From Swiss-Prot:
Keyword Cytoplasm included in the entry's annotation: yes
Gene: hpo-40
Biased composition (Polar residues): 332-346, 413-443, 617-634
Source organism phylogeny: Eukaryota, Metazoa, Ecdysozoa, Nematoda, Chromadorea
UniProt feature, compositional bias: Basic and acidic residues: 638-662
Predominant location category: cytoplasm
Residues annotated as domain Tudor: 138-203
Subcellular location: Cytoplasm, Perinuclear region
Full protein name: Hypersensitive to pore-forming toxin protein 40
Signal peptide coordinates: none
Organism field: Caenorhabditis elegans
Superkingdom to which the source organism belongs: Eukaryota
Amino acid sequence: MNSQQEWEHAYSLAERMYNKQAPTKREELNPTERVICSRFETIFDYDPFKDEYTFRDQALLFSTPVQPKCRTVAEADLHELKENTAKLNIPMPSYINICPIYALLPFTVLVFNNSQHAHKSLSDDMERAAATFRNPHESEIVPGAMYIFKQKHGKAYRCIILSEDGDMNIPDAERKYLVAFIDNVQIVSVKQKTLFVSDQFSIKDYPCALHCARIVGISAIRKSYVSGMNQFILNFYDAKEKRKAGMFAFIYKLDKEEKKLVIDYPSLLGTPKTTSTEIRTAVGHQIVASKDPVSLTFEQLNKKEVPEFKYLNSTDDDSDVELDLIEHDTKSVNPVASSHPTSSSMDDCPYGRASIARAKDYQLRLPPHSQKGLSSSSLLGSSYPVSNSIKNDITKQSESNRADATNISFSSFESTKSDISPQNNQNVEETSTPTVPPNSTIQENEEDEIMSPASIIRAPSRLAGSLNKVSIERPNTPLPTSSKNSEHNMSEISTYEASSISSHHLVPQSPSVPKTNYTVPVVQRPLTAPEKFRDPFGGPGSSDILNTKMLCSEKNIVPSNKFGRQISPGKDDKNENYQYSRMETKPQTLFAPVLDENQRQSSSSNMMCQIPDISSVAQGSNAPKTAPNDSVNSVAPDDIHETDKRGNHCKSVTEDPKDNKDPTAVTTLEDPDINDENFSVQSICSETFVETDQKLMEVETGADAFTESITDQFAQMSEGLKKLAINLADSVRTAAIEKNHDAFIANIHAMEIISKKVPDDIDKRFWKMKIVEARKLEAAFD
């Protein structure tokens, strides 16, 4: 593979990752793609903890190749060395003489076993086969691969690539790589022209003394700590006498899953600590190996002790589960069937806080219709078993409290007392266990009850519903009129709730709301806007397209030119039709990632909200009214052509002036108080939207005449652009009313962008006038 072919593969792979917008696992790539990703560190970023590649966000042009640079070796590149470590035949646990060489992520320390000698015939065999060696191409060098380093006098050594060293803007033969010898204790930077490849002398055929290991108790180290650890190793390695003498390390075991040795050795800094303790002290670890034994102390390592291993938090999956089979001394009463789960720890005292809280929670979840005629004692008995004496005490206390709080007549009091007599108590308990509805239903009913005018007028029933949550009604439920229903609602207050109410408590009163019999009509008119005016994310709002363009123009993001695909040359900017189509019909899918999800939702929701006409509702009219933004979807320029999903040209969408006579095709607000051309003093901000004092006087004396002069002044401008400006101004007003500052700013920016693109001066003046009027609405957010 030459340099051009390598670049073509890298460019194609980068484009695929960019379009995917997600990391790619190394296992999902074929061998050629793995080599490409490992060689182009300038384009692809590798995460050794997740073993995946991501594209570095940058601008790439196919005509401008990027120079490759080999990335640093990772644990995933050491397959051959791991297999060599798994075949190591030494007693474990034991002490061996090692020399640490290099540390890499997630956590592997390359250690050289000084006790293991190289193969006897390896050196002679490589000297005899030196004539068959060949220099590898620059595209064949990958991290972790084994090569043969050959000196000038003919001596050959096996080594692996650790990283690329030096400048990459040099000829291939002069490139330098940091290599580690696998048969000698040596790390050196060599040139590419001194490296050779051969089909013989693999690690599988000739085992080496370089092994993969990790420190006991630590499964992964932090990314920022590996550079400091390599600096400690380098300082130890630079001293030749230390490198040759090595140090004693204790081998705990061989991790068969990771194919690495679990070792520990004294600190390389000379402190009285072990390496595992030193890493933990510096918080250099990221993941802890919980299955490893407890590490030895520094004194035990110096004395070369081999104690019995100890494990922390050892949990065997196959061990027996301890069960509590001891029978309790207390005898439990057979509980009554109930849908509420009971707990033995909460049933100790029926008057305790836990029991009361549980009974209250159960009553809150009961439907309103199921609690008619039930007293607090029957509800208490249906929740958990209690004795009859306790029920009678609760009944008496409940009756006395209700008499004080609600002023119920003696006859109704006697009828209530007869309902909970002991002879009928069992029947009440058996029938008081209805199916509990979902919590969402109760919450919805509660909100409706709070917001309904009927609940505001009915103060006593509302108080009972807020305390006991049993009188929740829909807004259209008729108000209770009989005294019997009132007494019945108040009888549903439980013991612990009614005790907190006294006769001198005042019921809070809210301002009365007149009851209305009208219903707001829902507009059922289908949208007539072309496909290009609709929200690319699924919503019908057209401001998303303008917001997208505004954000993309501000950030100068051009995704279509990301990988060298140039945009077609533009036409004359003075052409109105081209300007408008380029501004509105350009596909928006390329810019979709720029918008935030919250911006999309706020913009779409505020552009399509339906505001009923209050004046027509007050008059009793049932004629449907449309929101101001419905006109945005119904307005389209004459030169816009609709295309299907494949890009085929479809029938052009034009506007017929006769359509305005259709009563169903409502395009603007019919409220005479709201003027589309000029915002009057009736606006929400209590301000006028005229630039000069003279115009202010005209608005105060005669707004209609001023609006008529404005209409005549801009009679020659394009009807489509005029309606678009009016509709965007309505959208700004709607955003100001709803206090949605994001949608407010986005619509104003969209108007400013369009005003700069329109070709005619009369159009520019009209758009600028609308922008000035819209800007003054910002006072609503003060």
